[in-house]
Amino acid sequence: MAHLFIFGLGYSAKRIKRALENAGWTVEGSGSDGDLAFGDDEAIRAALGRASHVLSSVPPDGDADPVLDRYGDALRHEWLGYLSSSGVYGDTGGAWVDESAPAGGGRRTARALCDAAWLARSARVFRLPGIYGPGRSAFERIAEGKARRIDLPDQVFSRVHVEDLARGVLAGLDAPPGAYNLADDLPASQNAVIEEACRLLGMVPPPLQSLEEAGLSSQARGFYAENRRVANGKARRVLGWEPRFPDYRAGLRDILRRSSP
């Protein structure tokens, strides 16, 4: 019977779990919303013994991968998956980037090391851009007064709706090992996303600010230090994946529709 174990049942992995359970899979997992504690070696190893597939969404700890460090010897499964980041490509100056590009040149060197370690184990590595969806979108930032429009002309980012992410991982269950970018079709500036969300809400967008005026944290400033467009052609060709939400406009409309009484 198809049985998946997920390390790290967070926002994205919970959607994957739900989609697989709806398809008849048995899914176990660790994490704050999982059945098992990551440090419970005996229970985790028993669960890994029951699983036919293993997926990790656990981020690096320093330069190390916590899952591989602690349970790598138990990962002899034919199907391994890892949720990585398109940040491994670094800054491309707004140019398109696909899976043939070198990884490790950006600020996320630890993620690139973990990405490579999972690829070395013949895993399916899903490189993800900014993830958004219900409960985690521009609407929440606007409601919390945290939405910012930063004056950085020509800067763009890629993103993916969490439901399309889950569908991409499901499509990857029958795919050969390798890296797969799961991004929608329309890279766009963060400003464009905020402006569209405000338009849908009938609100005036926040004022345009410089990075200095916005008072962003160092982590947030790092987000704006990179500029790239993530290509999804390989996922379309090899996985047969097609995003249900091909751009942020479609995704935001659906989120708002679902949240309306």
Regions from the PLM with identified roles:
Residues A13-K14:
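N-terminal Rossmann-fold NAD(P) dinucleotide-binding loop
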Residues P102-R127:
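Active-site Tyr-X1-5-Lys
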Residues D33-D73:
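NAD(P)H-binding glycine-rich loop region in Rossmannoid oxidoreductase-like domains
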Residues A166-A220:
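Mid/C-terminal beta-alpha module of Rossmann-like enzyme folds, strongest
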Residues E195, A214-E242:
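Conserved C-terminal active-site "lid" loop/helix of NAD(P)H-dependent oxidoreductases
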Residues P246-P261:
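Amphipathic terminal alpha-helices
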Residues R70-G106:
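Conserved Rossmann-fold NAD(P)-dependent oxidoreductase catalytic core, especially the SDR/UDP-sugar
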Residues G133-R141, I150-A171, G178:
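Substrate-positioning beta->alpha
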